[in-house]
């Protein structure tokens, strides 16, 4: 399998329709050719500005268009962000991602954002931001400050996109990705599964990503988290096997990219997550919350990694150089002390 940029939707649908075992086997072969086996990269995501977003993304509890339980918060102080980054590093993350609920960053906010980037970089962490649409000039400023990654998801296929968002065009998203790449930063871009899209739309999303001039370095695959108050609160559940298939397809189509299990992981049981890793996922967000939605806690993740024999990148880069077996033993003790060990499992149907 060679790295390609000329996929078609029909070709991807044929790939998706392969027998499950054959597809997973093919994805694992590709994974071991291009990626480090039994290895997961760990990132932490912090919401640095929450709620009151003018966009109308139907999946998002931070949109000002919908009534949800998300509290509106102003842009965090730089020192508060740096304190959170220190905690993330001490918990084992190697990349610190900062997200702001904006259509686009205002010029008055740029100095604070640049200081956040510089401060996090000084800790030895990789940096990532998601701030909405950015101009070429803003991309240059972020890059000069040391930003490693910029996240801007395509969300779904061009054909289905208008059913989910009307306040930002698909081309707006592609233009932002172009600005990011031209500024020399790495791209984090993926989509959301479970918004009512068809199999063809799912294939179309991955075609758009894989046919970019250069594949995104990181491809987050989100499973919709249904939030009360949003138009998609009653969306149909995603079939776990369909989701795992899509992880495998992403791995085959973008073999050199990190494929990240992102939102929705809280509702996946251990077995589903294990199959996702087998299908080629090799990155996760670490911590109990992703922006405003739940995420498995750190102890649970480390326990799962231990069961699977997975080495997380974060262990070797802990500031105090705690060895992996020592950390895992401590985690096991903490988990064993819990009153209910069933907390290690999640119902995929929830």
Curated annotation (Swiss-Prot):
Requisite cofactors: [4Fe-4S] cluster; [2Fe-2S] cluster
SUPFAM superfamilies assigned to the protein according to its UniProt record, in alphabetical order: Radical SAM enzymes
Cofactor remark: Binds 1 [4Fe-4S] cluster. The cluster is coordinated with 3 cysteines and an exchangeable S-adenosyl-L-methionine.
Keywords: 2Fe-2S, 4Fe-4S, Biotin biosynthesis, Iron, Iron-sulfur, Metal-binding, S-adenosyl-L-methionine, Transferase
Listed EC numbers: 2.8.1.6
Reactions it catalyzes: (4R,5S)-dethiobiotin + (sulfur carrier)-SH + 2 reduced [2Fe-2S]-[ferredoxin] + 2 S-adenosyl-L-methionine = (sulfur carrier)-H + biotin + 2 5'-deoxyadenosine + 2 L-methionine + 2 oxidized [2Fe-2S]-[ferredoxin]
Binding positions ([4Fe-4S] cluster): 53, 57, 60
Domain of life: Bacteria
Quaternary context: Homodimer.
UniProt-listed NCBIfam families: bioB
UniProt similarity note: Belongs to the radical SAM superfamily. Biotin synthase family.
Protein name as catalogued: Biotin synthase
